[in-house]
Swiss-Prot record:
Record-given protein name: Replication factor C small subunit
Domain DOD-type homing endonuclease per the UniProt entry, residue ranges: 183-313
UniProt keyword annotation of ATP-binding present: yes
Family: Belongs to the activator 1 small subunits family. RfcS subfamily.
Keyword set, alphabetical order: ATP-binding, Autocatalytic cleavage, DNA replication, Nucleotide-binding, Protein splicing
GO cellular component: DNA replication factor C complex
Modification after translation: This protein undergoes a protein self splicing that involves a post-translational excision of the intervening region (intein) followed by peptide ligation.
PROSITE patterns per record: INTEIN_C_TER (PS50818), INTEIN_ENDONUCLEASE (PS50819), INTEIN_N_TER (PS50817)
Record has ATP-binding as a keyword: yes
Species this chain originates from: Thermococcus kodakarensis (strain ATCC BAA-918 / JCM 12380 / KOD1)
Entry-linked SUPFAM superfamilies: Hedgehog/intein (Hint) domain, Homing endonucleases, lambda repressor-like DNA-binding domains, P-loop containing nucleoside triphosphate hydrolases, post-AAA+ oligomerization domain-like
Amino acid sequence: MSEEVKEVKILEKPWVEKYRPQRLEDIVGQDHIVKRLKHYVKTGSMPHLLFAGPPGVGKCLTGDAKVIANGRLFELGELVEKVSKGRFGPTPVEGLKVLGIDEDGKLREFEVQYVYKDRAERLIKVRTRLGRELKVTPYHPLLVNRKNGEIMWVKAEELRPGDRLAVPRFLPAIAEEDPLAEWLGYFIGDGHADSKNKVITFTNTDPSLRQRFMELTERLFPDAKIRERIHKNRAPDVYVNSRRAWELVSSLGLAGRKADKVYIPEKGWEGIRSFLRAYFDCDAGVDKNAVVLATASREMAEQVTYALAGFGITSKIREKKVRGKTYYHVTISGSENLERFLSEIGFSHREKLERTLKLVKKPNPNLDSLNVNYELISYVRDRLKLNFSDDKRSWSHRKARKISWELMKEIYYRLDELERLKESLSRSILIDWNEMAERRKEIAEKTGIRADRLLEYIKGKRKPSLRNYIKIAKALGIDLEPTINAMRVFARKYSSYAEIGRKLGTWNSSVRIILESNTEKIKELEEIRKIELELIGEILSDEKLKEGVAYLIFLSQNELYWDEITEVKELKGDFVIYDLHVPGYHNFIAGNMPTVVHNTTAALALARELFGENWRHNFLELNASDERGINVIREKVKEFARTKPIGGASFKIIFLDEADALTQDAQQALRRTMEMFSNNVRFILSCNYSSKIIEPIQSRCAIFRFRPLRDEDIAKRIRYIAENEGLELTEEGLQAILYVAEGDLRRAINVLQAAAALDTKITDENVFLVASRARPEDVREMMTLALEGNFLKAREKLRDILLRQGLSGEDVLIQMHKEVFNLPIPEDKKVALADKIGEYNFRLVEGANEMIQLEALLAQFTIMGK
């Protein structure tokens, strides 16, 4: 198969989305559920529903990407390996929180649901102007600002130089000031620990810094003997003889360490402000435009950018060769950035402080800007008739916030006014002439219009002027003035006489005369009212307008910096990749420098069948794991529930995914919300475990339990997809897919697509390769050899599975547990072996060496087989 065909298979839309059921008939293997749901469609009514069933993977980065988890900086690979214990695929995790952004571009802390490890043959390497470097899978989405001003998630393979990558403007500072952290900053900057003599020296030409280092050393290490030394031919230093200080730097791996290996130790992170100030005092310089920190350690440079982001300071990394050696320059430039650096970190070094203060007064207009979607902003301006005339396509961050905030204030006023105008325009201005005839005498008295004139109006011999018409309506208890005024305001402010005239098929001057004069053309005035009501409805339901308003809200509130992409390059090889699954927002902050990276079927099918083409208007999808809590969910529900369903439906549907992520208190609040809107809203709650849903909610719902699918149901769907995609699906390949899927259709489809990337012929060999599973016959053979007493051959087979096939020990144990029940041995031995497998699995979880433990388990098999 050609490389070109392989790439198409890898990069196209995931098949789990492509073949997601659109109708109830398409749902596989859940006939008992489909039958009940179809009954709801037929009757047009339904109770609240609770969908319970197992979960379903994401886009990935390389392991060297940095990520802040639970307030500490990790390499992504290190973090995932620690949680998964080397296992490939998804591993559930609890209590792990990472930083990400919400829909308004604001930084939030999110719970990670599971970590993920996989392999990839292709990666996309992205470099930016500020020195960021990301290696991600081709279909990994990144949040970018495009040249046309659009802000959108774009697959890595579709990125182009000139696109601007979303970068968090602020990260939470990891800790406050700390004398030990400050001492470490000085030591790593200009200190040295002599491994031979076990003494520490601090070399610096600034007397105040040497004095500060001596004060800290005396305070932190009571056993220290300290001496300041002034030399004739080299820089002065501070000599420290302290067992405690030596043991500290030695325990941190900093004794005798070369400059290209230094890093920020954990104790430095605990007082990162103090560490950075001391480190910058030693190793940073101030040139004509920026503060520049030079280090030979890429690890240190990347950590410093994360630490600076904790104080809202954006920096960039540049490589520089000096006499054949690579150095990394962390650069802080731009007036706003430097000002924040001085206020949050600062210099103790007086000369550096004074030079930086001068730079603050020289702003750089080329930094900290973004491309704006002028076409979309202009559309909002023209649709709502806003007073705005800036036609520049690139704005600074400050300008974007200021202008969008001013526009949003005006937009909120206009939308509120439009809602009020709509309410006024929704009332007809036509009166009941029969009622007027019956009450003619009374109306004459109230209005001062002669009774005979009223009779002429009734018989149609004369038409009343608008002024008299309003008086008559008022006498009948109808106030027309708000409606007439609303018509005039809308025509002047939000539409035009010409637009209304085109709709009416008349001249704009005629419309103006009818609207603005004491006209007698009441029927034409009523037609204008209907047209204006239609136009105002079009404005308020205008999807492009909503998109534009959302865009302006994002500009006014986001906490992002936009870093220009300078290079996009494809890499080929055998890569191990990692991901964190963040439910709800599906993104987190990662990279060598902080960057924003990305990561329901039955409910959607039911909504489509119940509401037809109006399903989008009557269906709201929310995620219960939203970090902002039940109050935000409740507000969205209120906003959605206050309008009537479209298309004749008697209720709307709110789909609440991951409902079991809610706390008990939040579920109680949800119960009250469900009761409050039970008249016109039905809730569908989706969860992995119905036992985690409180009884009061369960009792209000019809419960649907989605069971693992039967092999024949999965096989039918897999054959259909394979035929549709032009694949040759062998029977062995199909059976292998069924084996690894274990009743999960989503997993089966993912495995099929991954195998198709290798070859259009789907064989069992390719399936087991992409699924990171051993062949079941290999596992059975290994266990059989051990039971027959051939321990060395069984051990050789184990090593083949672990090393050649690249599986983890836990993967092998899981398959052994599955296959032990297929062995031709007595039941009591199966029970004993299953118990042993469980025992050794616990040992691996506790961190024991997997090769030793698995060989010991095979030894147990050999003993039991005798």
